[in-house]
Amino acid sequence: MTALTLAASASAFAAEGGNPFIGNWALTIPGGGAGWLGITQEKGYYDGSILWGGGSVVPVASVFFDNDTMYVTRVNEVQRKNDAGKVMRTHQFTEAIVAKISGDELQLVTLHGHENGQGLSRVEFTGKRIPPLPAKPDLAKVKFGDASTLFNGKNLEGWKLIGGQANGWSVENGILVNRPVQEEGKPHRSYGNLRTEKEFEDFNLTLETRLGKGNNSGIYLRGIYEVQVSDTFGRKLDPHNMGAIYSRITPTSSAEKPVGEWQTFDITLVDRHVTVILNGVKIIDNQPLLGCTGGALWADQFRPGPLYVQGDHTGIEYRNIVIKPVVK
C-alpha cells in the first residue's frame, strides 16, 4: 500500500466519523469455535490482538486498511528438520485475514498457504462488534440471591461432560475429582471438561480446590472466562498464574499455596467486570473483561452460560462449590 493510498483510506474514515473497525469483536471462527479480535489506533499506526480458539490472546503481526477493507496478518514459523532432527531451515508463513464491515458485523476470510508449499486455504467466518464496556460496578450496591450448592458431594447430578471425550471425573469422599489416566504404551486418551447443566448470568462463586504437582485446570465463568487453576507457587507473576483471567488479567500479587493444600476462591462477575479473591487475598479487583478466553464455549459475552471446570489437562480436585446469582 502506498503512502497516498493509506492517507486516502485514513481520510475516508475521518470523513465518516472515525474508523469503524476499531474496537473489540467476538469471532465465530472456522469450525464454530470462539475467538476474539481487538483493533486499536495508536500514534501513527494501527495494532491488534487476536484469540483463535484455544491458547492465549496474542499480538497480530500487522493491521492495515485499503479503502473499506481491513487486513490483519499473523505469522506462523515452520521448522524444517533433517532425518536426525536438526533444524536446517525456518520458514515463516503469513496468514492474511481480510475483513469487510456492515454495521456491527464483520465478514472475514482467512487465507494462508499450506506448509508443504502446495495450495492455499480460504475459509470464511464472521465477527460481531462487542459493545463498549459499562462503568465499573459498585459491588457494595450489588444484590445477590440465595446461595445454591452446585456440587452435592455424592455424585455428578447437575453436571455433564462437554463433547465426546473420556470421563475422568468422579466423586471420592465428598470431593469432585478428575483423574485423566494414561496407559503406558497406548495412544494418548483425551479427557473431557465438566459443566453444570444450569446456566447463569452474573454471580458470586465460592469454591475450594486442591492441586498436585504440575496440575493445570481452570474455572470457566459463564463458559467463556477462564480463571486459571495451576501449580504456579513460587513462579513470577504473569497472566497464566493461579487466579489469573487466562492470558488477559495478571494477578496483582501471588496468593497461591504449595501443592497439596486446599485453596479457596471467591469470584464475583458483574457487568463484564471480575473480582478474584484467592486464599483471602484480592488479586483481581473489579477489572474489565474485554472478551472471552481460550477454550470458551462461544464468544458472546451476553449469553448466559454454565460453570465449567477443565479436565482435559491433568488431575484436579474441587469441593464446596456455591453460587449466588446477581439480582437485577
Model region roles, listed by residue range:
Residues 1-9:
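Bacterial N-terminal signal peptides
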Residues 15-328:
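Carbohydrate-interacting regions of secretory-pathway proteins
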Residues 10-14:
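Sec/Tat signal peptide C-region and signal peptidase I cleavage site
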